[in-house]
């Protein structure tokens, strides 16, 4: 089995795998569109848009990332689907593939992903990091048609009283 897509450690949802090296090479080269849902603290302004800021390592030895002018180009589209009690549900689409991209971009937007231990949302007290890869759409190299895989899981906006600050 060969991974075609990957997820950060605490992110959940769909991943794309290939059965062999040939299929892997074809799927890596194929056009893919990923969609994520995130429960975030706050309400992004504007409610939808494009985040286009570069991402770099926090320091040469660090695994963490930050927005910095000398970083690699990183672009993410976002749209607010719902807001309730100061928590927003965002639809996110990474247009580049940087490490921790969506988590860093949400933090830069001022709307940290709930339950994110590295980028400011850990104190939410909720049920883990609320970032889910809800779908991946890709052109199947053998079937010669577009396919979409959807997750049966999604982020949770149902927090007991007092758990979200």
Residues of each region from the PLM?
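RNA pseudouridine synthases
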Residues: 1-165
């Amino acid at each position: 089995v060969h991974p075609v897509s990957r997820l950060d450690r605490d992110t959940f949802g769909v991943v794309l795998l290939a059965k062999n090296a040939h299929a892997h090479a074809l799927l890596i080269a194929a056009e893919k569109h990923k969609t994520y849902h995130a429960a975030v603290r706050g309400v992004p302004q504007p409610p939808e848009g494009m985040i286009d800021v570069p991402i770099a390592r926090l320091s040469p030895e660090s695994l963490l990332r930050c927005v910095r002018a000398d970083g690699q180009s990183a672009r993410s589209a976002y749209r607010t689907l719902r807001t309730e009690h100061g928590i927003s549900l965002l639809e996110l689409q990474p247009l580049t593939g940087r490490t921790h991209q969506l988590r860093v971009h949400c933090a830069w937007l001022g709307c940290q992903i709930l339950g994110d231990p590295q980028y400011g949302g850990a104190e939410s007290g909720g049920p883990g990091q609320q970032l889910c890869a809800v779908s991946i759409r890709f052109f199947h190299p053998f079937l010669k048609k577009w396919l979409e895989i959807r997750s049966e899981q999604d982020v949770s906006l149902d927090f007991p009283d007092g758990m979200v600050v």
